[in-house]
UniProtKB/Swiss-Prot annotation:
Family per similarity comment: Belongs to the bacterial ribosomal protein bS16 family.
Keywords: Ribonucleoprotein, Ribosomal protein
Protein name: Small ribosomal subunit protein bS16
Pfam families reported for this sequence: Ribosomal_S16
Keyword Ribosomal protein in annotation: yes
Organism, scientific name: Methylobacillus flagellatus (strain ATCC 51484 / DSM 6875 / VKM B-1610 / KT)
Amino acid sequence: MVIIRLARGGAKKTPFYSVVVADSRNRRDGRFIERVGFYNPLAKEGQEGLRLNNERIAHWRDNGAQLSDTVARLVKQAQKSA
């Protein structure tokens, strides 16, 4: 099954997440198909904390990809702020 989820990056105690399309059998930070955005939970004021490519997310959802709970929340948040 293909899933759209967060892959953790960044240094210790400073998380940075990539929003990726991956096979659910692969590790969280492992191999992925496509990177469709990023999420920075520690973004300072004036910095971009969330960027999603909604066209590509819609494309993958139409082709059967599932959203993780956190990514679904972020997509809803991005649509509300846009």
